[in-house]
Amino acid sequence: MTIGIDKIGFATSNYILKLNDLAAARGTDPEKLSKGLLLKELSIAPLTEDIVTLGAAAAEPILTAEDKEKIDMVIVATESGIDQSKAAAVFVHGLLDIQPFARSFEIKEACYGATAALDYAKLHIEKHPDSKVLVLASDIAKYGINTPGEPTQGAGAISMLISSNPRILAFNDDNVAQTRDVMDFWRPNYSTTPYVNGLYSTQQYLDSLKTTWTEYQKRHKLALKDFAAYCFHLPYPKLALKGLNKIMDKSLPQEQQDQLRKNFEASILYSQKVGNIYTGSLFLGLLSLLENSDNLKAGDRIALFGYGSGAVSEIFSANLVPGYEEHLSRTRLEELDQRQALSIADYERIFFEEAELDAEGNASFSGYEDQSFALAEIAEHQRKYIKVEKSS
């Protein structure tokens, strides 16, 4: 029995901030962002959009009524939690009308959380091969106006339906993880934005990659020559490119080195238009690779490197299933290009707006007509979500 990704989906906001505009407003050389980060645009989420609405929007298009009857576990991986007690997965479970006899919970470890969620889902399917697990990696990366991290913000969610006999990717039982207690990036409960030691975090990312990759090769007797592509956690694509350069085997035939680099370019196309989505960034890269590479084929082995500050890293691999390409979109880049670009003033107002509650903890919201799901109101401190009905 194989276990892996049977379906995969993605959702992001309808608003973008062009990094050339941000560079002009902040007095920064545009090439510092376009070449220094390899980013072009950032997804900007309004107040009515959060990890619940994005997660539900990513999942709804890929799920059938039969899927919703077979799903008995919903996991949301996030570091953008909207409640200290109630899991976002519970809200999503209700919005998607999934059958009631299911576990729903949240996983947190910075940007690593979704990789941990896949590990948990895989173990569950091993014991219950007829069930399905919905894994959502949903986050809003928000650093603040005129901060060093401002050009690496973003918003979005990846949905993955995990099952036996999957139709896209089959996991290999080869995971190698590493934990190191470091303070490269953190967000205390009292802060709405994170604290970042940027250079130190870059060093931790690259060293975690190098040491985990060395251990992975030693344990499994595999090398870079055994892989058609390598996907990385993508806080910004330039960091992942540094990672690829660090592990590149110069003894490989030039043709294979070129294939790995070409597939890396395919894997960053979506992130360049979305920005950082924390837990979902690795899997947005995977989706971008699968939908944009012109050289992958069934049976190819893909390596994946997950990293979450603090820090936990993990390397694992999966093989493409025959017919995988039939379950992917070929129009996503065009759809991303159709979103509304914001002025700097509108970006600052929309992205950093906070709910203004009255004395009883109430607030109502509007302007969410273009969303699939929305935070419509807060009533007595309770978040109320709706599925947005589209007018014909």
Regions found by a protein language model. Give the residues of each.
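Catalytic phosphate/nucleotide-handling subdomain of diverse soluble enzymes
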Residues: 287-337
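Conserved catalytic cysteine-centered active-site region
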Residues: 32-36, 40-50, 80-132, 249-281
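Acidic, glycine-rich active-site loops and adjacent beta-strand->loop/helix elements
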Residues: 9-11, 77-82, 109-114, 137-142, ...
